[in-house]
Amino acid sequence: MTNEEALAKINGRLTFGMKPGLRRIKQLLEELDNPQKKLKFVHVAGTNGKGTTCALTASVLRQAGYTVGLYTSPYVEDFRERFQINGEMIPPEELAQEVELLSPIAEAHDAVGDTVTEFEFITALAFHWFARRQCDIVVLEVGLGGRFDATNAIDAPEAAVIASISLDHTAILGDTLDKIAFEKAGIVKPGGRLVLYPWQAEGIVEQLRGICEERGAELILPDTRYQVLEESLEGTVFQTGGETLRTPFLGEHQVRNAVTARTALEVLRRRGWRIPDGAIREGFAKAFLPARMEVLSTAPLCLLDGGHNPGCAAALRDALERFVPQRKVGIMGVMADKDSHEALRLLAPLFAEIITIAPDNPRALPAEELARTAGEFCPRVRPAQTCGEAVARAMKAMGPGDALIVCGSFYLAGEIRDQLKGKLANLQPDRLPQKM
């Protein structure tokens, strides 16, 4: 089986949609001899911030000398970004081997009407690959929610982490914060340990405290006292617990995510993991997360952000107001199932001009519809039919010293990255996961 055939097999499962529940994934794993039981995990849920928390935690553990698996989503340019060991993507031939092994098992379920979803398939694949490669520990990002997410087929992790909780995927997870928090709390196992991002909406911390008490789990809340010492487009230096740390990430929310990750690492230390202070400093400084306020170019300034809900939009607005005072041109594309009106209300007034585009995804909002909404908040908005057209229009609209901001969807970020690379000078070094 070739890599292309493997990807086609995986993508073919997208037609089976989303079917929350753990029965199918547990059956798949049982037929693979339960690879997840041979692994240790840090399990991370949350609406916003879980990607940063995963990236920081995995980076530190790698600096500490461990073989670290990372399972995350979404990808930006290459599907294989979702499966990494020590910062390197699964090789094409190994992805093909895993798909070839798993396909007959999944197809047997399909044949009796118990179809295996794409996420269940790739989660089982990830566990099997990480176990085969003998990872010391895996940083595991929840796909959606937590309670019925396929990643929750694991036993109690070394640490569970819940990042910031806000309204998203309300049709599936519920239309109130307490309903969504309950779903996220599904990753808390009896007798386990939960590190909870403490800057939650009112009532969420107490709700999670009660759930932990019911399950005999320990709740660990990070110290909310920290001090930002320096911040720029190059990153942030902050102090927490007498320790000075630097991350390449922008915004106060990212400092809070880093404080949460730092607390999770302390829980691992208590569990016997050897994590020197130097590994924490180096790991935080070297962590990378594509398309999260990523500086793609410095002259002209180009920022790439895949955030897709109002919470992400608010964080991006804050960063733009603080770090990007110059005239801004935007390229925006969103999914139809997201609250684009609220995101545009927050962001669009900052732009002199916006070009809208529909990302290459069946759920994408048409560019014309997005342009109509954006036009309520920005004086000049034009739809484009292709990424190439959007980039060309944006570059034409920019004057000397202007900034280009690409935002609204990870699907858009991945599509447009190569288009921008061919047209921007002073590109930052490409830090996407390396190929094995």
Regions found by a protein language model. Give the residues of each.
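Nucleotide phosphate-binding/pyrophosphate-handling subdomain across enzymes
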Residues: 38, 137-140, 148-161, 165-169, ...
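Acidic, Mg2+-coordinating active-site environments of NTP-dependent enzymes
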Residues: 109-110, 134-141, 157-244, 258, ...
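Beta-strand->loop->alpha-helix junctions that form or flank phosphate-binding loops
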Residues: 71, 196-199, 211-232, 248-252, ...
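N-terminal leader/targeting and accessory segments in enzymes
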Residues: 1-48, 52-67, 76-78, 193-201, ...
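Active-site-proximal loop/hinge segments that shape catalytic or ion-binding/gating pockets
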Residues: 409
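C-terminal helical cap/extension that packs against the catalytic core
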Residues: 198-220, 232-234, 301-302, 310, ...
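ATP-dependent carboxylate-amine ligase catalytic core
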Residues: 22, 26-37, 63-155, 171-173
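Short, flexible loop segments at boundaries between secondary-structure elements
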Residues: 359-361, 427-436
